Amino acid sequence: MNSTKGRTTIDVGTDGVAIITIINPPVNSLSLDVLNSLKESYDQALRRDDVKAIVVTGAQRKFSGGFDISAFGKIQGGTVAAPKPGFVSMEILCDTVAAARKPSVAAIDGLALGGGLEVAMGCHARISTPNAQLGLPELQLGVIPGFGGTQALPRLVGLAKALEMMLTSKPVKGQAALSLGLVDAIASSKELVNTARHWALDILERKRPWINSFYRTDKLEPLGEAREILNFARAQTRKRAPNLKHPLVCIDVIEEGIVSGPRAGLLKEAEAFQGLLHSDTCKSLVHIFFAQRGTTKVPGVSDLGLKPRRINKVAILGGGLMGSGIATALILSGYSVILKEVNDKFLQAGIDRVKANLKSRVKKGNMSQEKYEKTLSLLKGALDYESFRDVDMVIEAVIENVSLKQQIFLDLEKFCTPHCILASNTSTIDLNLIGEKTKSQDRIIGAHFFSPAHVMPLLEIVRTPKTSPQVIVDLLDVGKKIKKTPVVVGNCTGFAVNRMFFPYTQAALLLVERGTDIYQIDRVITKFGMPMGPFRLCDLVGFGVAIATGGQFVLNFPERTYKSMLIPLMQEDKRSGETTRRGFYVYDEKRKANPDPEIKKYVEKAREIAGVTIDPKLTKLSDKDIVEMIFFPVVNEACRVLNEGIAVKAADLDISSVMGMGFPPYRGGIMFWADTLGSKYICSRLEEWSNLYGGFFKPCSYLAQQAAKGAPLSLSVDQAKARL
């Protein structure tokens, strides 16, 4: 077979054990070539008289990361023929591997995810290293396990645990897999294949059980109990993911196998997988999967052959919520951190916040006490710059004050080495302004974390025209090491995420002042898939932040900002959101939000100040209209961000909207979702509202041009006028 394609090799030892090795770097994914080769290798091993038993393993200490996801898009687009339904699950795994007259053992190191674990479950036994990861994460991509996993996993670990593993997509490590019965023994990487060889021969000699996973029943709960478990799982799934169909399909397929037998279950699995593969949800989630992995491809940066420099020590200026969160993220990934504050009281408060962040992990069972102590030892406090002389990067996270930040960057130049990266976590101030008094503007960069910084997955890396590509490469590497998805954006008010979403709340305010109910808007937007509606979000971030951020947009984009007095009026009355337990909602002792009838008087006053009246049409909007009137202005601003080159590509805006604002990933991100509706439709609706309600809704020139051509709003990298 062509060595550039994925393949398997077969090597027969003197003991009569054939070692079949999956080779498809970097994670030995199961491409169609690999699957066909696996079938050929198995057929050969079963034909050969010198082969007594079989061990399946993966090259480079990785079993298999699962089905090749890049093939999904090709199959969806019709450029590659899909394997016939059931080819892998029935023809290869059930009828060839599991039914073979020669025993098979899977030797698992590194990863056995998705199709990789399904291949392993087709074998008669599994040996794993202690830290190998085993799981079925297919639901994250909008499909179900399609190589027999829905039938084999419940029979190996029991129905309740199998449902949990599939519905949460969370893998287990080798040691935990042993206690569940998913693997039969643990071995070191060095001894793994040898242990598997001996195990396979022991099965042949009947010293160990010869088990066909598909027909095992001893781990399955009695039918009545199984139905109860399945019904409970359905109820929980409908509650947690009301917009998603595929988790319920997964439960149905599992049930079919339990009630009607594994063969019926495999047939239903194959049919369901085929249908889900072509669903909008799957297309959206596959797009997000690749968008997340594509953020580090930045023209003029990642294509220069630059290697990231080693960052050992990082200093954080400011121990507030953001600074302490950034410090937590860094020490959790093994970086030495200096946290600087202006006095002992503030410094101790910052260190205490970091401790609290770590202690919550201990409390949840995600960190041992020993690991807590070791991680905390990486943090040191400081009140001056003396200890900054050997730091590799500084991240400034002080209050949003231009002159203060300018002075800090001047001081940093005096104390830090010439190679030290000077980063700011500002979310509103122009980076050029912050660094204008410094001599070395090539090492100034934005590192915009989202709060809480140790939890939120996105990191906006903001570059100015003077920022060195090397500094960007360095920060991309740090972002990945601290388990963030780093997105490189240009320098502008709000950068990418905050700028895209500034019309989100403004559109909601416009609707409310013209008669739409506040709580209806929040209900509809939450039903659409957002974590919360715009008014609940305002309460969460606080009115002070909302007014300050809004002020930046009024200043920079006056012609398209909707100016409402609703929030300032409420703040005057000491309503500031969740912190004061009164905002758009009232909050009880447990911080539960409840609608507040008093809000009407503020809305009426804001309406009077704005000089607008209730529009009867806006008092009875459909859910669809509310979603479009809230999100189409966001799409409009995203088009500007893309056209101005603030973002390199539309996919970066998609992943940013998902990770920065909670846009539902199963809709593919803001631009992907917009393209499913069409530029013509979006433009026509914006024009209609612009005529009725003013310039806030006016389509930008880029959106209008794409609509006139009937072209999608997403641009490829080489089309983008990257003003980075």
Region annotations inferred by a language model:
Residues 94-106, 110:
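Conserved catalytic cysteine-centered active-site region
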Residues 58-93, 112, 140-143:
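Glycine- (often His-adjacent) and acidic-residue-rich active-site loop
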